[in-house]
């Protein structure tokens, strides 16, 4: 069974974990209605994506 030869220092452990932090979600403005929306997602308020209406407005709202 594999066993560590030396104790991992706090510095090495923390450097390894430096990429584990949560990043804030990215949001952009919908060009159709101006509401905030996630990139590469259909706008939840107006149902538009890439300049086209993909979801009808009564379903989106």
UniProtKB/Swiss-Prot annotation:
Pfam families: Ribosomal_L32p (PF01783). One of its GO terms (molecular function) is structural constituent of ribosome. Residues 1-22 have a biased composition (Basic residues). GO terms for biological process: translation. GO terms for cellular component: large ribosomal subunit. Residues 1-27 are annotated as: Disordered. Keywords: Ribonucleoprotein, Ribosomal protein. InterPro entries: Ribosomal_bL32, Ribosomal_bL32_bact, Ribosomal_zn-bd. The keyword Plastid does not apply. Belongs to the bacterial ribosomal protein bL32 family. NCBIfam families: rpmF_bact. This is Large ribosomal subunit protein bL32. It comes from Rhodospirillum rubrum (strain ATCC 11170 / ATH 1.1.1 / DSM 467 / LMG 4362 / NCIMB 8255 / S1). The gene is rpmF.
């Amino acid at each position: 069974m594999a066993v560590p030869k030396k104790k991992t220092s706090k510095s090495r452990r923390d450097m390894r974990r430096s990429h584990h932090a949560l990043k804030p979600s990215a949001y952009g403005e919908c060009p159709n209605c101006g509401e905030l929306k996630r990139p590469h997602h259909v706008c939840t308020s107006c149902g538009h994506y890439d300049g086209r209406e993909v979801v009808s407005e009564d379903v989106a709202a």
